[in-house]
Structures are given as structure tokens and as C-alpha cells.
């Protein structure tokens, strides 16, 4: 699954259709298997007789029981025919053991993403999402990856390291990934992910590693109360030791951490939020921290810091403090940058809510998701397109819901923001755009666009194609040439909860060509209230308090 940043009304657009969908039953294992599998019916009644050095063994259904050493087949005249019956079953078994992609089925990838910003010999590596229940860290890393312009220096961002755990709102589906960097068995499901991020950390250009976390309460060197004490991790800059050998870039870890903490403490929202440096003195015997990503980086001779925002905060406030700390370290590393939002809790929240979108079928279907309805029904899509969906943020994903074939869930971090019920269609690629007259002017609208309409729009007829405006009930099969006005659409068919976005779909016979969206005068839209879309979920605390 890829992601891409899209302009607010830019290219990427898709929608659903009126009428009942073409229902396709989800395939079972039997229907997914090669066509020779039905021959099993003949094979079930066959009997093979085997003899070993110890005794003869009778087997049914190719299941051998009892001691078998050197089998000798009886009924030699029927041996080849019986093997011919069993061989397809063996092939079927091997086929089912192949990776999904090798069988030609949809493979929904949740590998982590590395976004490379800027170009310089020395790189700052920023990692978010190593624990899936810490949305402040992976949300901040997402904004760094998508809303910052690196003008001097280089920054590599991994915003979604433990993507499956992010989606499932879990600290770790297979245990705590941040405790797998000292040693890890190859049988661990996360072995490939851990090895890949270790390779990235060891990259000769990487000189500084920042690992973003959400920690409980407020770290204090001395006990103050149950929220503010040495067992807490929130609002701290973590170092594993005081420093690295002379000559290591930013190797004076304690000094660098103190400088950044002092800088961020100049712009606290409340005095309670003050940052402190927390030296875990890992090499002195902290067995848990010895397994962490940051200590792995230190052992590779790289300056590394853990940045902890408090879990007591909503996600936008956590991300605000994360970005404040990250910017402090970037400045100290000589990185110059610009961002396109204000570094305030409100500005961060607006940036996280903005520019949410997903594109399917090579951009012939685009859905803006900032105010999307909880369910989008009968969205025409070709089979296989959900696994290749393009999202606007790297912590967004399109995955099957409960029914693999009938429902798709769009995730934003650890929230599901909408559910799509697809209408699976064959695609027609012979048309790229349609001609329209919108508010008296003619335009050519490519599929995947959002078209702003003040009053009226007409789609020009195109020979061989028909138009279906979703929510506009004309009683005609082809709605090209008809005036389309906001008042003529049933609001419940809109893509957004505000009732301003409507799908216009184009078909050639039964094949789907593409769609674009009509956005009617937004100033007349009702405001949708009371729905949270930001990734935000307080995670369960570990016994260590983070």
C-alpha cells in the first residue's frame, strides 16, 4: 500500500452508484484452489496398500498411519493411475502454501514506510510507531514526513514502524517490539521488520536517531505524587548514558538532551508539562532498556534519544511536544526546515485533520475523507485495487473488514474512519475525462477530480458511455445532459457528512470507467459535529510505566 500527499481538491476521486451491487460470493479455500481439486471426490474412494519391512499398512485418503520405512506398492498395474489421482492433491497443497502474492491474490501490505527528506551526507533518522498504542509519536512523525520542507540537511522518517499494531490499537501484536533489539529469534513474526530498521540505523549516513514515544504521567527525578515520579516516562528526553566517545556526532548525550529540554520548556502550555532529562544508565544493568531501539543505536556508535510525550494529553498536544523536541534536535544537528502549519496544539490538530484522502484504480476513484460518512455504499472498484490504494498519509491503510470480499475499512492510525462496501466491476480504460458545463463555463474534468459547483452542472453526452449521478433520481439510466443541482440530490447519498460532495460515475455498458465528485457551494453546507477522526487511544501501561 502506498501513500501520497494530495492537494485539497486535487487529483484522486471515486464514488459509489445507485442500485444493487453485483454480489460476488467470497471464495472459499476450495474455490480458490486450482481447478484439479474436484478430482478429490474420485480419490477419496481409492485405497492404496503399502508394505513395510515390519507390517502392511492400509491407508485411506493418502494419510499413512503406522510405521512406514521402505514402501512397496501392490497392484502395480494400477499404480500409475492411483499416483495420477494423488498428484493433483499434492500440487493443490503446495499451491495453498505459496505466498498470497505468488497465487495472484490480493496482498495487503503493512510494511513500514521510510520517507527521505532533503539531501546531505549526514542523516537524522526519526522513528514513530514502534508501539502501536502511542498515537502522539506516530502522528508527529507523520506530520514531519508530510508537512515539512527540509531546506538544508537530510531527515529520514519512519512514521509507522509497527504498522499492524498501530491498526489494531495494540502495544505489540507479537510482544513489545522495543524489546527485540538485543537478540531475536528468526522465527519471531517481527524478525524481518526489526532487521530492516536495524539496517537503517546502521546506515553509514545516519548520525542521529530519535525514537518517539508516548509515556505515562510526568517523569520526575524525585517522587511528588502518583503521576509525577521516577517511575513515569512522560515529558522526558531519554538517554542511555551520559555520552559517547569523543568525535561522535552529537555524542555528548546528556548535554544535547538538556539543551533541547531547556528550549522546549520555554514554550510550555502549562508548567506541569515541563521536560526533564532521564538517564537510564542502561549499560549499568538495565536489562529491559538493553533491548531497546535507542540502545541498539548507541551500541552502533550513533547518538540516540527517546522522546516521550505524556499519555495524559490528547493526541494533538502530544504531537505538539514531540515536534517541539524534534525541531530542537534538528536545529542542533544543523538541519534547516520549514513547515506549513503553526506549531501550536491547535495548528497541529488542524494539520492532522487536513488532507485525508484515498485513491483507487490508478486515480480513477478519489475520496476526500476529512468529513467522510461512516459508510460508503456500492463504490465501483476493480478487483485487486484496494491492495494498491494510495493514501494521503503514511499511517493510513485500506484493509478488508470482517468480510474480506464485501467490506473495506479505511484506517487512520488506530481509528477506522469509514467503511466501504464495494461494487466489484470490470474496468474500461478508453476514457480519461468528461466534458461538462459548470455554472455556464465548459471544462474537461479528468476522473479523480473534485469539481466545485455554485449552481448547476451538466455532463456532456459521450457516445457509448452513460452517466450515473449518485443521489440524483431522474428515472433515467443515463443522466448525461441533465442539469444537476444541489437541491435535486438526496443528502444521504453524499460522500461527506456535510452533504456537499456527490459522486458522478461513468460506465461503458457494465464496465466502470471512473468517477469525479461534485462539491456544491460549501458555505451552504450544514456543519458536521461531534465526530473524532484523529488517532487517539490511551494504551495500557506496561509494568515499567510506559
Question: Where in this protein do the model-derived segments appear?
Answer:
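Acidic, Ala/Val/Gly-enriched low-complexity intrinsically disordered segments
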Residues: 2, 27-33, 40-41, 54-57, ...
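Short, basic, low-complexity termini and linkers enriched in Ser/Thr/Gly/Pro
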Residues: 33-35, 94
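Compositionally biased, low-complexity flexible segments
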Residues: 7, 11-13, 20-26, 63-67
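Bacterial N-terminal signal peptides
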Residues: 84-99
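N-terminal amphipathic/hydrophobic targeting modules at extreme N-termini
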Residues: 15-21, 25-32, 41-42, 47, ...
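Low-complexity, intrinsically disordered or signal/transmembrane-proximal segments
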Residues: 8, 49-55, 74-75
Amino acid at each position: 500500500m502506498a501513500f501520497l500527499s494530495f492537494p485539497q481538491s486535487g487529483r484522486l476521486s471515486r464514488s459509489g452508484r445507485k442500485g444493487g451491487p453485483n454480489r460476488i460470493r467470497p471464495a472459499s479455500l476450495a474455490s480458490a484452489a486450482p481447478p484439479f481439486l474436484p478430482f478429490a471426490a474420485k480419490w477419496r474412494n481409492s485405497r492404496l496398500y503399502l508394505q513395510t519391512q515390519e507390517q502392511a499398512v492400509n491407508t485411506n485418503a493418502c494419510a499413512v498411519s503406522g510405521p512406514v520405512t521402505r514402501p512397496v506398492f501392490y497392484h502395480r498395474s494400477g499404480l500409475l493411475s492411483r499416483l495420477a489421482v494423488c498428484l493433483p492433491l499434492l500440487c493443490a497443497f503446495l499451491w495453498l502454501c505459496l505466498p498470497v502474492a505468488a497465487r495472484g491474490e490480493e496482498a495487503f501490505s503493512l510494511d513500514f514506510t521510510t520517507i527521505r527528506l532533503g539531501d546531505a551526507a549526514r542523516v537524522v533518522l526519526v522513528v514513530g510507531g514502534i508501539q502501536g498504542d502511542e498515537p502522539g509519536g506516530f502522528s508527529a512523525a507523520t506530520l514531519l514526513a508530510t508537512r515539512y520542507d527540509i531546506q538544508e540537511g537530510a531527515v529520514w522518517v519512519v512514521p509507522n514502524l509497527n504498522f499492524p499494531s498501530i491498526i489494531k490499537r495494540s502495544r505489540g501484536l507479537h510482544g513489545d517490539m522495543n524489546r527485540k533489539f538485543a537478540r531475536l529469534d528468526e522465527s519471531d513474526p517481527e524478525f524481518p521488520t526489526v532487521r530492516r530498521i536495524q539496517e537503517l540505523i546502521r546506515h553509514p549516513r545516519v548520525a542521529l536517531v530519535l525514537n518517539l514515544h508516548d509515556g505515562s504521567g510526568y517523569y520526575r527525578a524525585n517522587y511528588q505524587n502518583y503521576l509525577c515520579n521516577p517511575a513515569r516516562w512522560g515529558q522526558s528526553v531519554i538517554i542511555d548514558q551520559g555520552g559517547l566517545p569523543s568525535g561522535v556526532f552529537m555524542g555528548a548525550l546528556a548535554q544535547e538532551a538538556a539543551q533541547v529540554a531547556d528550549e522546549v520548556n520555554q514554550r510550555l502550555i502549562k508548567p506541569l508539562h515541563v521536560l526533564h532529562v532521564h538517564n537510564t544508565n542502561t549499560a549499568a544493568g538495565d536489562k529491559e532498556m538493553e533491548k531497546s531501539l535507542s540502545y541498539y543505536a548507541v551500541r552502533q556508535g550513533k547518538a540516540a534519544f527517546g522522546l516521550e510525550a505524556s499519555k495524559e494529553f490528547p493526541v494533538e498536544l502530544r504531537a505538539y511536544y514531540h515536534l517541539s523536541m524534534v525541531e530542537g534536535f534538528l536545529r542542533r544537528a544543523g538541519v534547516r526546515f520549514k513547515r506549513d502549519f503553526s506549531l501550536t496544539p491547535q495548528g497541529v490538530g488542524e494539520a492532522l485533520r487536513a488532507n485525508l484522502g484515498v485513491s483507487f484504480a490508478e486515480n480513477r476513484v478519489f475520496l476526500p475523507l476529512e468529513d467522510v460518512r461512516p459508510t460508503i455504499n456500492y463504490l465501483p472498484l476493480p478487483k485487486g485495487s484496494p491492495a494498491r490504494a494510495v493514501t494521503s498519509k503514511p499511517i493510513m491503510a485500506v484493509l478488508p473488514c470482517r468480510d474480506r470480499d464485501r467490506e473495506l475499512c479505511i484506517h487512520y492510525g488506530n481509528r477506522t474512519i469509514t467503511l466501504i462496501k464495494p461494487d466489484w466491476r470490470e474496468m474500461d480504460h478508453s476514457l480519461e475525462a468528461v466534458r461538462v458545463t459548470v455554472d455556464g463555463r465548459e471544462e474537461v474534468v479528468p476522473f479523480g477530480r473534485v469539481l466545485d459547483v455554485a449552481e448547476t452542472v451538466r455532463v456532456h453526452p459521450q457516445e457509448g458511455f452513460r452517466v450515473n449521478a449518485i443521489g440524483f433520481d431522474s428515472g433515467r439510466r443515463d443522466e448525461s445532459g441533465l442539469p444537476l443541482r444541489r437541491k435535486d440530490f438526496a443528502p444521504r447519498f453524499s460522500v461527506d457528512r456535510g452533504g456537499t460532495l456527490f459522486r458522478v460515475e461513468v460506465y461503458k455498458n457494465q464496465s466502470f470507467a471512473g468517477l469525479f465528485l461534485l462539491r456544491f457551494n460549501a458555505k451552504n453546507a450544514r456543519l458536521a459535529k461531534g465526530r473524532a477522526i484523529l488517532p487517539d487511544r490511551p494504551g495500557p501501561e506496561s509494568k515499567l510505566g510506559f
